UniProtKB/Swiss-Prot annotation:
Swiss-Prot/TrEMBL cofactor(s): Mg(2+)
Keyword Cell division in annotation: no
Gene that encodes it: aroK
Organism of this sequence: Synechocystis sp. (strain ATCC 27184 / PCC 6803 / Kazusa)
Entry-linked HAMAP family: Shikimate_kinase
Protein name per UniProt: Shikimate kinase
GO molecular function: ATP binding; magnesium ion binding; shikimate kinase activity
Family in the record: Belongs to the shikimate kinase family.
Residues where substrate binds: D44, R68, G90, R146
Protein location: Cytoplasm
């Protein structure tokens, strides 16, 4: 019943999940979408489909700028959708143009601490930006660069180490109504 009310209040507005890699956007997103009866899109998966290769290969063969161009293109298409939960890449906030797309929906920042992200990303060989000697230093630098940009989100959701993804989705659903403007009836206009 509460979910029906939230769906009605959202009126099909997209939810964009932002945050650092390892924050759980691709894990929480489908759970949130399912509870809302929304579609789920993982922007990184779509970028790979458009490019016809893995993100690591895009970085290696074409460079980060090409990846960011593809990311912006895919985000533009996703922003035109409705009733969708969209997990974005961690660096989506770096381009001003991307914010114009993100503002087509409700932007939710899954905020993980450096310690949490380190624990989740240790040994991850799939993420090109993390293929460095000192993972903690790299993550710390990326976090410092991106936190002020993530802070522009409509909602900041601080993550805890042992939080269940389903519980996170539930807490987000409980928080969303407070972010939405009350609907005016025709009689009030």
């Amino acid at each position: 019943m509460a979910q029906d009310l939230i769906k009605e209040q959202l009126q099909g507005v997209n939810l964009f999940l932002i945050g650092m890699m390892g924050s759980g956007k691709s894990t929480v997103g489908p759970l949130l979408a399912e509870q809302l009866g929304y579609r789920f899109f993982d922007a990184d998966v779509l970028i790979e489909r458009v490019a016809g290769k893995a993100i690591a290969d895009i970085f290696a063969e074409d460079g980060e700028d090409t990846f960011r161009d593809l990311e912006t293109e895919v985000l533009g298409h996703l922003a035109a959708q409705t009733r969708s939960v969209i997990a974005t890449g961690g660096g989506v906030v770096l381009r001003r143009q991307n914010w114009s797309y993100l503002h087509h929906g409700l932007v939710i920042w899954l905020d993980g601490s450096l310690e949490l992200l380190l624990a989740r990303l240790q040994g991850d060989e799939a993420r090109p930006l993390l293929q460095v000697e000192n993972l903690e230093e790299r993550l710390g630098n990326l976090l410092a660069q991106r936190q002020p940009l993530y802070a522009q989100a409509d909602l900041r959701f601080p993550l805890q180490a042992d939080q269940d993804p389903l519980a996170i989705a539930g807490e987000l659903l409980a928080t969303i109504p407070g972010l939405l403007k009350p609907q005016c009836s025709a009689e009030q206009n």
